[in-house]
């Protein structure tokens, strides 16, 4: 076996392993927050807003009143002023897994994959949002300083 033939399978294994690791959803919560960002890249507030209002992504407007949106839900707290009430670390935990703060929360666990009920086979083991998407949403929520 030549060196070239030995390297190709090793590279394939590394690529597959990196893809599995990229889907890993570990985070360390401290109290009511996740102090460390989930990614090395900072969140992008514009992308975060897009995720929040997109019904195929975050779908936050189904339950929350969202500043600037005309159609929204009213069964969850309004998001106006949330950036003044909560730190980015607190926002991160609420987006990742709100049940860590309130066990009765109906909010989806956007970055949790275990302990969930009635998950379609195609979505098992996959978070609703990627780590970068969580950081993007947190970046946008942190900009919401005004109560209205």
Where are these regions (language model features)?
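Bacterial N-terminal signal peptides that target proteins for export
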Residues: 1-9
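Solvent-exposed, polar/charged alpha-helical surfaces in well-ordered, non-transmembrane soluble domains
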Residues: 46-50, 89, 93, 135, ...
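Electrostatic cytochrome c docking/interface patches
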Residues: 24-55, 148
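Bacterial N-terminal signal peptides
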Residues: 8-17
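Short pre-active-site segment immediately N-terminal to redox-active cysteine/selenocysteine motifs
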Residues: 55-59, 67, 133
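Sec/Tat signal peptide C-region and signal peptidase I cleavage site
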Residues: 19-22
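Gly/Gly-Pro-rich "capping" loops immediately C-terminal to redox-active cysteine motifs
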Residues: 61-100, 106-120
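C-terminal capping alpha-helices of c-type cytochrome domains
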Residues: 112-148
């Amino acid at each position: 076996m030549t060196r070239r033939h030995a390297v190709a399978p090793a590279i394939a294994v590394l690529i597959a392993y990196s893809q599995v690791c990229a889907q890993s959803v570990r985070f360390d919560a401290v109290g009511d927050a996740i102090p460390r960002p989930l990614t090395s890249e900072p969140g992008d507030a514009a992308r975060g807003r897009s995720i929040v209002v997109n019904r195929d992504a975050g779908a936050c407007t189904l339950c929350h009143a969202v500043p600037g949106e005309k159609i929204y839900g009213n069964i969850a707290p309004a998001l106006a002023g949330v950036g003044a009430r909560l730190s980015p670390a607190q926002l991160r935990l609420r987006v990742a897994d709100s049940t860590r703060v309130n066990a009765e929360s109906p909010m989806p666990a956007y970055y949790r994959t275990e302990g969930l009920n009635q998950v379609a086979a195609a979505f098992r083991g996959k978070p609703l949002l990627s780590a970068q998407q969580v950081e993007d949403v947190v970046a946008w929520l942190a900009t919401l300083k005004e109560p209205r």
